[in-house]
Swiss-Prot record:
<keyword id="KW-1003">Cell membrane</keyword>
<dbReference type="GO" id="GO:0005912">
    <property type="term" value="C:adherens junction"/>
</dbReference>
<dbReference type="GO" id="GO:0016328">
    <property type="term" value="C:lateral plasma membrane"/>
</dbReference>
<comment type="similarity">
    <text>Belongs to the MAGUK family.</text>
</comment>
<comment type="subunit">
    <text>Homooligomerizes; requires L27 domain. Interacts (via L27 domain) with ajm-1; the interaction regulates ajm-1 apical junction location.</text>
</comment>
<dbReference type="InterPro" id="IPR027417">
    <property type="entry name" value="P-loop_NTPase"/>
</dbReference>
<dbReference type="GO" id="GO:0099072">
    <property type="term" value="P:regulation of postsynaptic membrane neurotransmitter receptor levels"/>
</dbReference>
<keyword id="KW-0963">Cytoplasm</keyword>
<dbReference type="GO" id="GO:0007268">
    <property type="term" value="P:chemical synaptic transmission"/>
</dbReference>
<keyword id="KW-0965">Cell junction</keyword>
<dbReference type="GO" id="GO:0004385">
    <property type="term" value="F:guanylate kinase activity"/>
</dbReference>
<dbReference type="InterPro" id="IPR008145">
    <property type="entry name" value="GK/Ca_channel_bsu"/>
</dbReference>
<dbReference type="Pfam" id="PF00595">
    <property type="entry name" value="PDZ"/>
</dbReference>
<feature type="compositionally biased region" description="Polar residues">
    <location>
        <begin position="697"/>
        <end position="715"/>
    </location>
</feature>
<dbReference type="InterPro" id="IPR015143">
    <property type="entry name" value="L27_1"/>
</dbReference>
<dbReference type="InterPro" id="IPR008144">
    <property type="entry name" value="Guanylate_kin-like_dom"/>
</dbReference>
<dbReference type="GO" id="GO:0019901">
    <property type="term" value="F:protein kinase binding"/>
</dbReference>
Length: 967
């Protein structure tokens, strides 16, 4: 290739980007989209190649533990991937292939020598035939990425400690439709005195209307023939919470229910613990690890307790008679969900469109509330007469479907991760959706909306009851199973009424009912802390439903003359239970109040579930984030024995903080494991010694907040590269001192620099893509690198301005052009995380703009000051990933800037004065906002090292739950 051709090739991607920007006319959308895919794919492939080479250098070539032969083998693997071409990094499962079996025990070796390589194995998603039959010709001699099927890369590690406990960690790198995903599954257990391995598992179930859904036997008064007194699970009931959760197995041993020990106890103790456990139940299970272990037989004495009913302690014992069954009664486990291969199940999206119009594919990422929608329909459970399709009947607030915005009530779900739902049963559709991973691909057919009422009156339909532990009374006994909620922890089955919505008066109204065999047919909640008694659910086909006069959201005021306006839940339940026919009710419809109550209870429930799933921390425990680096070897005085070092951002579990000088703590790893106990300096010691050090060296600089005079955003130092203009030109106010949001910052008047030592933190589940804020050295360069390298994951947000649009500018793309007065009001109402004025025009970043980027599944790159971090946390309840780049000197800033600017011909080099000014500014930022950083990056050797650590932190902090400041 000639030198001239080489130069043209280097500029090719820039030329394509420039051409893409010119496609603004209507009709160019498809061409523009395809060109953007070309650009994104190229950059993604380039990034993968660079990361491969970086890992090869860091982990293999620099390793002193690997032989030359091992290094050569790793080099060959990289060659295979690189020579595989662009498709090596972009394999996707073909839409026309059949469903793959991901449960095979056989695996395909990674390379052609068929030997195990240190716990790694390669599995072709197509099954054994593809793995070994075709694999010898294709998979084994080519890159594992170069295939049209879904692949797994497994790594399994086992650790056994001296005390008999073991831990097995399985790491899978999965090639999904959305790219490579790393999934980690951990199993823990113990080895008993007989050398038998037991696997331990903690699960959380929500009773809802379906109950726990399993039966138990055993106990000290009902031992097995060999004397085993354990509490065993004898059956898992179809439609119950245990089956929906999927983790409990038949023959599991229950060792604890919430905080009640169930080992070496009578059968009645376990039954009572489960009955009184409340709506959210935490279970500790153990099972034999041995695969050859046979299921327990039926030779148990006593009774088997059937735990399907969702009753609470307020229900009388007489109502529980139906829940006890003899062990002689045959119990058949539910059959596995069928796999359907209808005539449409193997079609591509394009082929679907020929038979089903308005089809499209959407990807959802589960959050704290799961997929966030309800379904109805299926064979034998038609939602629309003559139609067995699966319909979306409700979109759950703040769920993944609502955040995505494309799924609507009335849409049909045709496929889930290539599993066809055509002509399937309702139960199978639920199981398929329940067993999906964090990222779910749906093939949907958009509905016309003709058979669904999507107006505000839809609230009159029966809604999902929000259940509070020990505060729900069930007045029916029938099975309700025509609609399934797919929100996180939501009840499994709820009926969907076909009754048309009607107007309901808001004043108190009399209602007369006659009890039937199934009671009155509605549920009540409330009655605690002076709350009204609400009707939370109306059973379809029940007495209340058929009357047409009882609605979800009604407040129960009287029952047969008994006033319930200030009654407790127990008093209301007794009044309803003792009421004779006919039953005279006084109801008042209060939809707004009920929605507030429902939201409050749902938040409480989600908090309980989230805390239980993440391993609820003991109240006596204290978790902190370190806000400084600590090296025991640099202690001026003699450090105690077992001193433990740590870095900024490390999470520490404080075990003992009674001493004024030294604390006992354990370091918490990313996977939740904790190190051995060590000794760390106390908060008091750290702060006292730091203040003494500052006094000795007369350390007076940086005591003021960055405020408005120190140009905290740092944008004025941009040097005009084309990519940087996407940030800097949109915020010219950074050159002005008129920073609106900073006028009232209390931190600007702080007389003494704070000393950052430890910050109390707690875990919080998140269901959104977190924005990213880079602070410190070269943050402008790094922001540009993130957006340019991976625009599918990172994006800037559209700012607001009060100035009129210029030629070529488009509202919603370049800026949101708004009225100045309205923008000033929004700033006062805390709707902006940062705003300022330039040449009498306002510029700013709104909270909604940040959310818009997150709803697209991308990290919003924010070029803002540290004050914006506080505003995001306090005003928007958004926890950004804030990374501080800490330089060691001004010279290091010059070197890193030079490395980042190597391939940018339109950038001039940073001067020494600019580097020194930026170094001083970094020092002030650290002193002012040191408690707001998620992580700090220091002691780096190259620009690539910085970028690698930034990517690593963002990836790690994108997983839920996260550690957030505890207030």
């Amino acid at each position: 290739m000639s030198h001239e051709s080489s130069e043209k090739a280097h500029k090719a991607i820039e030329n394509v980007e420039d051409y893409c920007q010119t496609l603004t006319r209507h009709g160019n959308e498809e061409l523009r989209t395809n060109l953007e895919r070309v650009i994104t794919t190229f950059k993604s492939n380039l990034m993968h190649s660079l990361l491969d080479i970086h890992d090869l250098y860091e982990q293999t070539l620099l390793s002193e533990r690997k032989s030359d032969a091992e290094k050569n083998m790793e080099v060959r693997r990289v060659i295979e991937r690189l020579e595989g071409g662009p498709h090596s990094y972009n394999s996707r499962p073909a839409a026309t292939t059949s469903t793959s079996n991901y449960n095979l025990s056989s695996t395909t070796p990674l390379i052609s020598d068929l030997r195990d390589r240190g716990g790694f194995s390669y599995l072709n998603g197509g099954g054994l035939g593809n793995g070994l039959g075709n694999g010898l010709g294709n998979g084994l001699l080519s890159s594992p990425y170069n295939s049209s099927s879904t692949h797994y890369l497994h790594e399994r590690q086992r650790q056994t400690s001296h005390d008999g406990t073991w831990r097995e960690t399985t790491t899978r790198t999965v090639d999904t439709p959305s790219g490579l995903e790393r999934r980690v599954v951990e199993h823990t257990g113990v080895i008993d005195d007989h050398g038998r391995k037991w696997e331990l598992e903690n699960i959380v179930l929500e009773k809802g209307h379906t109950g726990l859904g399993f039966s138990i036997t055993g106990g000290m008064d009902q031992p097995t023939e060999d004397g085993d007194t354990s509490i065993y699970v004898t059956n898992i009931i179809e439609g119950g919470a245990a089956l929906a959760d999927g983790r409990m197995r038949k023959n599991d041993i229950i060792t604890a229910v919430n905080n009640t020990n169930c080992e070496n106890v009578k059968h009645e103790v376990a039954v009572n613990a489960l009955k009184s456990s409340g709506n959210v139940v935490s279970l500790s299970l153990k099972r034999r690890k041995d695969e050859a272990f046979l299921p327990i037989g039926g030779n148990f004495g006593g009774s088997t307790s059937y735990l399907r009913s969702g009753v609470t302690p307020s229900v009388s014992a007489g109502n529980l008679q139906h829940a006890i069954h003899s062990p002689s009664a045959p119990i058949h486990p539910p059959p596995p969900p069928p796999v359907h291969h209808g005539s449409l199940s193997q079609l591509s999206v394009g082929q679907y469109r020929s038979t089903r119009p308005n089809t499209s594919v959407i990807d959802l990422v589960k959050g704290a509330r799961g997929l966030g929608f309800s379904i109805a329909g299926g064979q034998g459970n038609e939602h629309v007469k003559g139609d067995t399709d699966i319909y979306v009947t409700k979109i759950i607030e703040e769920g993944a479907a609502e955040l995505d915005g494309r799924l609507r009530v009335g849409d049909k779900i045709l496929e889930v991760d290539h599993h066809s739902l055509i002509n399937t049963t309702h139960e199978n559709a639920v199981n398929v959706l329940k067993n999906t991973g964090n990222r779910v691909r749906l093939l949907i057919q958009q509905g016309t909306g003709a058979i669904f009422n999507d107006s505000a009156s839809q609230q009159f339909m029966p809604t999902t009851p929000i259940l509070r532990p020990s505060s729900v009374q069930d007045y029916n006994r029938s099975q309700m199973g025509s609609q399934s909620h797919l929100s996180y922890g939501g009840p499994l089955n709820t009926s969907y009424s076909s009754q048309a919505p009607i107007a309901i008066p808001l004043e108190p109204r009399p209602v007369q009912l006659v009890k039937g065999q199934n009671g009155l047919g509605f549920n009540i909640v409330g009655g605690e802390d002076n709350e009204p008694i609400y009707i939370s659910f109306v059973l379809p086909g029940g007495v209340a439903d058929l009357s047409g006069n009882v609605k979800t959201g009604d407040v129960l005021l009287e029952v047969n003359g008994v006033v319930l306006r200030n009654a407790t839940h127990k008093e209301a339940a007794e009044a309803l239970r003792n009421a004779g026919n006919p039953v005279y009710l006084t109801l008042q419809y209060r939809p707004q109040e009920y929605q507030i109550f429902e939201s409050k209870i749902e938040k409480l429930r989600n908090d309980v579930i989230a805390q239980s799933r993440m391993g609820t921390l003991s109240r006596k425990s204290e978790y902190v984030r370190a806000l400084f680096d600590y090296d025991p070897s640099r202690e001026n005085s003699v450090a105690p024995h077992r001193s433990m070092g740590f870095n900024y951002g490390d999470i520490l579990h404080i075990i003992n903080s009674s001493d004024d000088e030294w604390w006992t703590a354990r370091k918490v790893h990313e996977n939740g494991e904790e190190t051995a106990e060590g000794v760390i300096p106390s908060k008091k010691r750290v702060e006292k010694r730091e203040r003494l050090r500052r006094k000795q060296v007369n350390f007076n600089s940086g005591s003021q907040s960055l405020g408005r005079n120190s140009s905290t955003t740092g944008l004025e130092n941009r040097r005009g590269s084309r990519s940087q203009l996407s940030f800097s030109r949109k915020f010219p106010f950074v050159k002005s001192t008129d920073r609106l949001n900073d006028l009232n910052e209390e931190s600007s008047n702080v007389a003494e620099e704070p000393v950052w030592s430890y910050q109390a933190v707690e875990q919080q589940a998140i269901n959104y893509v977190r924005p990213v804020i880079i602070l410190g050295a070269l943050k402008d360069r790094i922001n540009d690198e993130l957006v340019n390298r991976d625009p599918s994951k990172f994006s800037s947000c559209v700012p607001h301005t009060s100035r009129p649009p210029r030629e070529g500018e488009v509202n919603g793309r370049d800026y949101y052009f708004v009225n100045k007065h309205n923008m000033e009001e929004d700033v006062k109402n805390n709707l902006f995380i940062e705003a300022g004025q330039f040449q009498n025009n306002l510029y700013g970043t709104s909270i909604q703009s940040v959310r818009d980027v997150a709803n697209q599944g991308r990290h919003c790159i924010l070029d803002v000051s540290g004050n914006a971090i506080r505003r995001l946390q306090s005003n928007a309840n958004i926890q950004p990933i804030s990374i501080f780049i800490k330089p060691s000197s001004a010279q290091q800033i010059l070197e890193l800037d030079s490395q980042l600017a190597t391939n940018r011909q339109d950038d001039r080099a940073m001067s020494g004065e600019e580097a020194q000014a930026q170094y001083s500014r970094c020092h002030r930022i650290e002193q002012t906002f040191g408690d707001l950083f998620t992580q700090e990056i220091s002691n780096v050797h190259s620009a690539n090292d910085v970028l690698s650590k930034v990517y690593s932190i963002i990836s790690r902090e994108s997983q839920t739950p996260i550690w957030v400041p505890r207030h």
